[in-house]
């Protein structure tokens, strides 16, 4: 029986994780649920899953949850960063699902890694912001790191065992691998007229053709910044050079990514677009459990198509690839800028095409400096957010 902590329990990854746990009740137990401020959602999850601990990042939300929870459930409610770190590093905890969106997930995820936990990484920003520090912490603690993102999980499944066992420190060429092919659907605006993009609304951007996701990641998919962040994450997870990574647009989202070998072979991972599949894989690796996902019906799939990304349509993807080549400081800046820009777009403060403008301005203007600690990363992240908000004021 594995005791699990779910960071981001009220989000879409949290819901999918709890679904897989419910399908395999003899193997997994919800030890703790962690959320930001969604009291009613957390209350419902507590009643259903009976965790020992419910942690709310927002202290007022924690008080509200405490007042609403039936006493007979005997669930401890906590709040505060120190309490969260104590929770993910507790000796009772076996596995941590790291699914808090954005930079907010970095500190607890890194704490779980340093404690040597089995970490299921759905928070791509952790590696985007702190790649080298994160990988070194994994190596030092002996933590098990498993990628939940559908693309990285697909790549992981297509890799030989010696690479799987050495994430972040592997040598792809020595294992006969020539390229990693990172697939992406192209999002809801793949075929829209370029001139129409400036007028696209948050509702349109969040209407993904294949996946069910939260608002931030949906917008990132529409700009293909999501694929850019995944490009950076793949660089750290699989220890790649930029020329070993390629982005391929695949609108049907049936092939979730591929690995190309030196002998000409290409191994692909396929399946219906449902996050329960990679979550179940990570939870049970190296075994297999039921995810509750319908098997892929090849007779219903029809045709599969592929094309190169158009960087005029997806400037955020180009910025991410460029930042990856520049190094850790640039990717930290880009991630922070993008979080501010996407939030502003979702709130109707800026237009869709302004997201790339804010990102580009920050990437070219925020001073970069060497980062040797988590404090350095957080400081650069904060500095970038201030500059990004200044750019928003100019666009308003």
Swiss-Prot record:
Class of enzymatic activity (EC top level): oxidoreductase
Signal peptide range in chain numbering: none
Listed GO MF terms: 1-deoxy-D-xylulose-5-phosphate reductoisomerase activity; manganese ion binding; NADPH binding
Catalytic reaction(s) noted: 2-C-methyl-D-erythritol 4-phosphate + NADP(+) = 1-deoxy-D-xylulose 5-phosphate + NADPH + H(+)
Binding site for Mn(2+): 149, 151, 230
Positions bound to 1-deoxy-D-xylulose 5-phosphate: 124, 150-151, 185, 208, 221, 226-227, 230
Pathways per UniProt: Isoprenoid biosynthesis; isopentenyl diphosphate biosynthesis via DXP pathway; isopentenyl diphosphate from 1-deoxy-D-xylulose 5-phosphate: step 1/6
Superkingdom: Bacteria
E.C. number: 1.1.1.267
InterPro entries: DXP_reductoisomerase (IPR003821), DXP_reductoisomerase_C (IPR013644), DXP_reductoisomerase_N (IPR013512), DXPR_C (IPR026877), DXPR_C_sf (IPR036169), NAD(P)-bd_dom_sf (IPR036291)
Requisite cofactors: Mg(2+); Mn(2+)
Positions with a binding annotation for NADPH: 10-13, 123, 125, 214
Keywords: Isoprene biosynthesis, Manganese, Metal-binding, NADP, Oxidoreductase
Function, in words: Catalyzes the NADPH-dependent rearrangement and reduction of 1-deoxy-D-xylulose-5-phosphate (DXP) to 2-C-methyl-D-erythritol 4-phosphate (MEP).
Family from the record: Belongs to the DXR family.
UniProt name for this protein: 1-deoxy-D-xylulose 5-phosphate reductoisomerase
Naturally occurring in which organism (per UniProt): Shewanella sp. (strain MR-7)
